[in-house]
Amino acid sequence: MHWEEVAGCRMPRCVAGHPALDFCNTWAGWGEPADPRREWLPDYDHFAVWAMHAGLVTGDACERLRRRAGRSRGAATEVLGQARELRSALYAVLLDGAGGADRSAFATVAAHAERAAGAARLVPAPPVESPGIGGPADAPTARWELSDRSGLALPLLAVARSAAALLTASDRPRIDACPGHDCGWLFLNPRGRRRWCTMSSCGNRAKVQAHARRRRADRTD
């Protein structure tokens, strides 16, 4: 099963190895005709829960976002539309590269990433316990954080930051897309050995189909 119940919402499992890729995987059937049944983010409520599920916002922030969205449905719908726009553009850039993708796709991702960078603030890093004085040499002193004051845009800004981090990583592993029917999910594939999003869904389905084809071929021989 490639989904699970989270805070009352059906969520796709995070199997990609990076939140930005899991965000792209909130749509299934890339390259296929549009079908609302392939959408994992049918409303803002699901978007907020997904951001929590992916580790991009806290549980408390998620609850605040859901309550606020209930009071400001128009604004919530607008943010959801922007998130879907970013998702489509990010998928194109990740799959084809910045040079191969439509320039408008990269421009869309860049605009969202720049907005997220402008909304971040530098805050002290959580303390790290260490027997030594001053803590480990590689322990960060501070970190970038998005404020809850970002309002309903918080999960959108968080995923844009995650996307920017992935796109600018010098040691980024190879990214592949699942060839399964009605899938196209992305995942990190550092060794190049992974083929499917998960063996329990697309992998097993392909095995069953291949077995059926072999049986039909045997009957015709």
What residue ranges belong to the model's regions?
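BZIP DNA-binding basic region
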Residues: 154-211, 216-221
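Short helix-coil boundary/hinge micro-motifs
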Residues: 1-177, 220-221
